[in-house]
Curated annotation (Swiss-Prot):
UniProt motif (DEAH box) ranges: 298-301
Keyword Ribosomal protein: no
Segments forming domain Helicase C-terminal: 401-553
Stretch forming the signal peptide: none
Domain Helicase ATP-binding span(s) in chain numbering: 178-349
Name of the protein this chain belongs to: Probable helicase A859L
UniProt xrefs under InterPro entries: Helicase/UvrB_N, Helicase_ATP-bd, Helicase_C-like, Helicase_Restrict-Modif_Enz, P-loop_NTPase, Phage_T5_Orf172_DNA-bd
EC number: 3.6.4.-
Residues holding ATP: 191-198
Amino acid sequence: MCAGFYVAVHPWLEAQSLHKVGHTGNLAARLHDGSYTTCFTDEWKYCFTLETSTKKDAQKIEAGVLYCAQFFRVKNKELVCLLPEKIKQLAEDVANCLDISYTLCDSPAYEMNDSTIVVEPSLPSDPLISKEKLRHLVITPVEDEEHFADDVLFFSTDETRTAIEDRLYQKEAANMGYQELRRSGRAILQMACRCGKTRVAYLILSNYLQGKVLYLVPGLSLLRQTLEKLYQYGISLKNVLLVGSDQTRIVLNHDNIEMTTNPVFIAKRIREAPSLLVIATYQSSTLLVDDFDLIISDECHRICGEWETRPFTHVLLNFKKGHRLFLTATPRYDTPLSMKNRELFGGVAFRYYLREGIEAGYVNDFELQMVAAPKLAHQPSTKEETTKQIIVKQIIMALAHLKTNITAPKMLVFTRDIKQAKELYAELVDQGVYALIAHSTLPRQVILKTFTEFCSSKEPVILLNCRLFQEGVEVPELNAVFFAAPRHSPRDIIQSICRPLNKQVQKPHATIFLPLEVNTENVCLDRFSSIIPFADALASEDPRFYEHLLNPSEVAYPINWIGAHGSVSELLQLARHAIRYGTQGKIDRLTRSERLPWKAAFAELKRTVEICCRYPKINDGFHFGGATLRFDTWYKWVIKSYLQYKNKEPSSLEPYQVSDLESLQDWTTRGVGGPYPWEESMAFLETWLAQNKGELVAIDIHQGGWIGLDATPMERLSGVLTTVSQRDGRSYGKNKKLRPKKGFMIPPQQAQDLDRIFGKHNLKWRKDRVNGFLKEDEHGNYTGEPTCIQEAYRTFKEYVKTNPDYIEKYWPGYAKGKHKHQELPHIWEKGLAPPRYKAFKDGNKQLIQRSPKKKDVKN
C-alpha cells in the first residue's frame, strides 16, 4: 500500500472548476471506496499525488493545503476552486515547509486488486500543523487574480492575424538586443503593449536555432498564442517541444502538436536533441533541465516579487547556462527581486515608448477624463458608504460620457479587491446599470460566460474586476477603463491603460477615467494625491504628456474633466500643479535630470555634437515642453551615470542609453574627458617646446582656446593653460572680496607635470608670491615677474595684428570670431547654437539666443 496526499477530479466537478483534495493510506484503493462511487460515476482520476511514508504525513499536507487555499474552498467540503497546477505547487510548498518527504506523481494510475482493499485506520480530524509556518503561503483572491487569468481565459480570445511585416523599430530592437546578448549575456527589451515583442524575439532567437532555445510564457493561453505566431513566422514544429498542463492537441494548418508534463520525456528530449525550441509556461518550468543556449522570458515583470524559489523564478535563480533575453512593456523595480538586479536581468537594450506606437499607428490613441466627486442627496452614516456611493455615481457619469459618442460602449472597471467589486456590482445593478462581475473565486465556466457576454453585448455594459483582466486579455471592442481605486505600481497602471488600446478600423479613441475626491467646494492639492502615481507612470511612457505638464499652453494633450460645475481650466491647472510639485507644492518633481525624457534630451545633445561640432558648454540652455532648463546639469548627470555604468557600479543609465552616447563622435575622449584633455595637451606641450628650442611662442589665454571637436592641438593647449593661469593664485575662500588670493588650486600631479616640462627649459610658469600672497597692487593687479604663459599671450596679441597667417594656422577661424563666440562662424550667424541659460536673483530663468549682432557678422 502507498500512502499519500492527492488531488482528484471528476467530470461533474470539473465543469465547475472544482477539485477534490484528500489524503489516504492507500492511493490504489481510495477512488474506489463508497464515498467516491456511491454518488458519482466511476470517472474519478488523480490529477497528481504526493506519495508519503505515512498516512499522517499525507493528512498534514491536506490540512496545510486547505488552510492556505481557504479563500477558494467550498464551505465544509474538501473541494477547492483552483487550477491543478496551482494546487500542485501549493502542496509541494506545504510539504517542504513541514519537512515532509514525498514523491510527486503526475496523473498516476494505481493498479487495483483484492489485496489493496483494506479498512484504513481513522486519524484525528484536525492534525496539528504549524499555521505560522504556512502563513506566507496563504493564497489571497487578489494575489491569485493574475495567475488565474493566465489559463482561465484560454478559449476567450481570438487575435486577428495580420500580414507579417518587419517594422523598422523591430529590426533595430532585434539588432540592439542581440548585440547586448553577445556583449553581456543578458538583455531587456522594453517595448509598449501591442508593438510586436514576439516578432523581435523571433528575429533574435533565429541566431540560436542551431542550438537549444527556451521560450517561457506566463500561462497556457500565451503559450498557444506564442506558438501560433512563431509558426506563422516560419518555425518548424519538428524541433518544437511544448511543456504545459493542457492536453488538447494544437492544430496549425496541416501540422499538429501536443503539450507534455512528463519529466522523463522532457529531460531526455532536451538532453539528446542537437537543436530544439522549447516553449513552456513558467508554472511548468520546474520540469526543465539546464541545457539551453538562449532563454527568453516573456512578460518578465511577472518573475519579480519575493526573493524565493517558485515556478516563476525557478529558471532565473537556478539555471546557469545560456544567454537571457527578457521581454516586457512594464519593468518592475519595486520588489525585493526586481529588474534593477543587473546581474540577473541585465539592462534595457532597447526601449519603444507607448506614444511611439500610437503615433506610428500600431496602437489606438486615448484621452484622459478626470471625474469629479458628485454631491450626494443624503449623506451616508459611514465614510466607507460615502466613498462607495460617490464611486458608483462616478461610474455612471463615465458610462454616460461614453454613450454620447458610442452606441454600445464597453468599460472595464478595476477595483481595489474582490470585496469592493462585489459591493459596487450590487449597487450598480440596483440602480439599473447593465453591469457584470468576474473574479478568481468564481468557477471557470462562469468567468468565461461572463466574459463572452461582455464581449458580445450590443448594449452599454461595464465589467468589474480586480486584476483578472489587467494584462494579457484582448477585448478588441473595449472602449474605456475606470480606476475605482488608486493604483500605485507603474506596471499595474500602464498594463491597465493598455487594455482598450487595440487598433481597429474606425474604432474611436479610448478613454481612461480617473475619479477624484474633488468638487468645486473642496478643491485643495491634497485631493489630487491619488493621481500622482498615475501621472508619473504615464509620463514615463508618453513624453507628450510630460511636456504638457510642463507647459500646457504650448503642448496640447487630450485631458479633460467631467462632472465639474466650476472652471474646468482652473481644476486642470490645479491637477497639473499637484502632479508637478506634489501636494505640498514645493519641489519641481519633473525637471530633475533623471526625469527628462531620454529621447528629447539626447536629441539635443546629438544636435549639439553633430551640428555645432562640440559638446555642451556650462551655460548652455534647453527649452523643453515650455520649461527653461540648464542643459549642463543634465549633461553632468549623464557623464556621472555613464562612468558608474562603465565601472560596473549602480547606474541610472540602461545599455541602450550607453549605446546612444557611444554613438556620438569622440564621446569617450571629448564627451566624457572634456575639450581640454590634460595628458594629451601636456604631451603636445613637451613636444612643442623641444621643437621650438624651449620657446612657448604664442598662446591664447583670454578666450580659452576652442572647445570644438575639430580643435587643433594648440587650441586645446590654449584652453588648458587658460585654466592654469586662472587657477594659479585663486583663493580657497568662498567670499573672494574678503580674502586675499593666496590659494593654489592646481592639483599637485598637474603642478608636477608643469614643473617637469617647463623646468627642462628653465621656464617660469608660476606667479610670484610674498609670504604666500600674490604680488599685487592696491587694485588687485599682478605686479610680479611675468610667467612664460603671460609672455606667450602678449606675443599672441601682437601676432593677431602682425602675423595673421600664424594665427590662422594654429587658431583657424580666429579672425571670423570663432573663439570669441566659441561657435563655428556659420553656426553663430545662422543662430543654430544652443541658447545661453541665465538665472536671475529673483528666481526667474531665461534662455538668451546666441545670435549675431551686425558688428559680429563677417562678410
